[in-house]
Design a protein with these regions (language model features):
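Rieske [2Fe-2S] iron-sulfur-binding subdomain
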Residues: 1-45, 65, 77-195
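A glycine-rich beta-to-alpha transition motif near the start of alpha/beta enzyme domains, typified by
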Residues: 49
Length: 195
């Protein structure tokens, strides 16, 4: 059975700001996939499916023991590859006891995840934003929950010409509406650049 999505699965997606991913488990959803993100003791970012194979308990609400995630419900323990390495009360761990792990890349100030075919994950295709991690630039970060369809946000964030008319006086100026827009399409990489 083929599943259809409005989003391409074989693409890199930002899962978090790099500073958000640490030694505490962080839950995020990317393309409808719940993820548990964390860093190993050496600082490498990890992304696992955020549901224990046993009772579907969120691993992001569990705890770390070294580099392993210990489920907060019954103690099933997973390594960084998503393989269950310990089940309390059992001498043998079932071969099928594993959660999905996802390719992760940390580029500039972001932790990126690849939800699609892991063999196709190429970190060199990640769009760069080096200024975000450059001390010569000021970057303001934050989250703003908005109760709307993602399409409305995309439409508004990609259409800067409306700033002059709707947001005039504080972020919109006549120069914004007059600025030429350049669009580049890299079909091979699956990237659209607008500047």
């Amino acid at each position: 059975m083929t599943t259809h999505s409005a989003f391409a699965r074989n693409q890199w997606y930002v899962a978090a700001w790099a500073h958000e991913v640490g030694r505490d488990l962080l839950g995020r959803t990317v393309l409808g996939e719940p993820l548990a993100l964390y860093r190993t003791q050496e600082g490498k970012a990890v992304a696992l499916a955020d549901r224990c194979v046993h009772r579907r308990f969120p691993l992001s609400e569990s705890r770390l023991d070294g580099d392993k995630v210990v489920c907060g419900y019954h103690g099933f323990t997973y390594d960084t590859t998503g393989t269950c390495v310990f089940v309390p009360g059992q001498k043998r761990v079932p071969r099928t006891a594993r959660v999905s792990s996802y390719p992760v890349a940390e580029v500039d100030a972001f932790v990126w995840v690849w939800i699609g075919d892991p063999e196709a994950a190429d970190p060199t295709t990640i769009p760069r934003a080096p200024h975000l991690a450059d001390d010569g630039w000021v970057t303001v970060t934050g989250m703003e929950p908005v109760d709307c369809d993602y399409g409305l946000l995309v439409d508004n964030l990609m259409d800067l010409s409306h700033e002059t008319y709707l947001h005039g006086g504080y972020i919109g100026t006549p120069e914004v509406a007059e600025t030429p827009i350049t669009t580049e399409v890299d079909e091979e990489a699956g990237i659209v650049r607008v500047s």
